[in-house]
Curated annotation (Swiss-Prot):
InterPro entries: KH_dom (IPR004087), KH_dom-like_a/b (IPR015946), KH_dom_type_2 (IPR004044), KH_sf_prok-type (IPR009019), Ribosomal_S3_C_sf (IPR036419), Ribosomal_uS3_bac-typ (IPR005704), Ribosomal_uS3_C (IPR001351), Ribosomal_uS3_CS (IPR018280)
Keyword rRNA-binding (UniProt): yes
Start and end residues of each KH type-2 domain: 39-109
Quaternary state and interactors: Part of the 30S ribosomal subunit. Forms a tight complex with proteins S10 and S14.
Gene encoding the protein: rpsC
Protein name: Small ribosomal subunit protein uS3
GO biological process per UniProt: translation
Region (Disordered): 221-253
SUPFAM superfamilies: Prokaryotic type KH domain (KH-domain type II), Ribosomal protein S3 C-terminal domain
Skewed-composition ranges (Basic residues): 243-253
Domain of life per record: Bacteria
Keywords associated with the record: Ribonucleoprotein, Ribosomal protein, RNA-binding, rRNA-binding
Similarity comment: family membership: Belongs to the universal ribosomal protein uS3 family.
A single cellular component GO annotation: cytosolic small ribosomal subunit
Length: 253
């Protein structure tokens, strides 16, 4: 199961959160899902020239406005001089959606271990006729140096302009796909080359999540159990609840 399913969707609600965070019911849901995709496509196309390095876009909705959180490697390219670029983008999205749009830009601390950015970097190199093997190996080395515990990259298509399409992959470290507490970042990117489209899939293992929280919960439960045992022992010895009841003498008629 873990070998086939999307690692992000497999962990939703456990260690991963949704990128669209809002609630609605009725036929409006389909319209809003479609609008979220339109927003993401527009932001990616609009900021492609700036090379901001967008890792992900999180959309939150209220009744009056839409809040968009953009996680980027170069936030300065999105904000622009004195915030001009981000204000223009906010106004454009307001016209498209018909609601007030607020944009927050959050910096990605380690872009070398973000699966989306790794995939886009490899796609850019393939489109500029760089050897796919060199691009994949360089990306893996950079990610491992940046602190990743495991990286796997797979390219499929007419690699190197070959007549017959094939798939090749490189892996370093470990990628636990079945472990739900394993923080595995996944992305799929398409490179449009002269020979045709090449699909790029990236898995990055960043370590386990919730291990410390689970240990803390177990410790708290053990302490509570010990306290309960201590209380029950104290009651049995001291307050007479645990002692045998004495029989009262029968009344004489």
């Amino acid at each position: 199961m873990g070998q086939k399913v999307n690692p992000t969707g497999f962990r939703l609600g456990i260690i991963k959160d949704w990128t669209s965070r809002w609630y609605d019911d009725g036929p409006v849901i389909a319209e809003k899902i479609k609008q979220d995709q339109v927003i993401r496509n527009y932001v990616h196309a609009r900021l492609k020239k700036e090379k901001a390095g967008i890792a992900k876009i999180v959309i939150e909705r209220t009744t009056k406005h839409i809040k968009i959180n953009i996680y980027a490697a170069r936030p300065g390219a999105i904000v622009g001089h004195k915030g001009e670029e981000i204000n223009n983008l906010s106004q454009e999205l307001t016209r498209i959606t018909g609601k007030e749009v607020k944009i927050d830009v959050i910096e990605v601390i380690k872009p070398e271990i973000e699966a989306q950015l790794i995939g886009e970097n490899i796609a850019y190199q393939l489109e500029n006729r760089v050897s796919f093997r060199r691009a994949m190996k360089m990306a893996i080395q950079q990610a491992m140096r940046a602190g990743a515990e495991g990286v796997r990259i797979r390219c499929a298509g007419r690699l190197g302009g070959a007549e017959i399409a094939r798939a090749e992959q490189y892996k370093e470290g470990k990628i636990p796909l079945h472990t739900l507490r394993a923080n595995v970042d996944y992305a799929s990117v398409t490179a449009h080359t002269i020979a045709g489209a090449i699909g790029i899939k990236v898995w990055v293992y960043k370590g386990e999540v919730l291990v410390q929280r689970l240990d803390a919960i177990e410790e708290e439960e053990m302490k509570k159990m010990q306290e309960r045992r201590g209380d029950s022992r104290g009651r049995g010895r001291g307050d007479g609840r645990g002692a045998k009841r004495r029989r009262r003498p029968a009344k004489k008629a």
